[in-house]
Amino acid sequence: MTMKIRAIVTVKGLVQGVAFRHHTVLQGNQLRVTGWVKNLPNGDVQGCFEGDETDVQALVEWCHHGPSRARVDRVIVERKSFRGEFDTFDVRY
């Protein structure tokens, strides 16, 4: 059985105004990851991803490049204990 994990991910670079959140939701849904993604006031994008470890890791890896118009400079990942608090993956405002 695959271990369930939670990751708090902060993506730095040109990641706002390039549909990063929208594409993160699409990727998350494809990977059966739950949680949220949002823009931060400083220009970063942050997400909380929960699911099977391999699926969450795949979404984190995708965040290293993001959608085609994005320019990712850095991805910071904080691994946390799985809480199982989400049923969906969506954009937060």
From Swiss-Prot:
Note the superkingdom of the native organism.
Bacteria
Question: Which EC class is this protein assigned?
Answer: hydrolase
Q: Which InterPro entries match?
A: Acylphosphatase, Acylphosphatase-like_dom, Acylphosphatase-like_dom_sf, Acylphosphatase_CS
Reactions catalysed: an acyl phosphate + H2O = a carboxylate + phosphate + H(+)
A GO term for molecular function: acylphosphatase activity
Q: Which residues form the active site?
A: 21, 39
Q: Which UniProt keywords apply?
A: Hydrolase
Q: Where is the Acylphosphatase-like domain?
A: 6-93
For this protein, what is the EC number? 3.6.1.7
- Extract the signal peptide range: none
- Return the similarity comment: Belongs to the acylphosphatase family.
- Please give the name of this protein: Acylphosphatase
Q: Which organism is it from?
A: Geobacter metallireducens (strain ATCC 53774 / DSM 7210 / GS-15)
Upper lineage: Bacteria, Pseudomonadati, Thermodesulfobacteriota, Desulfuromonadia, Geobacterales
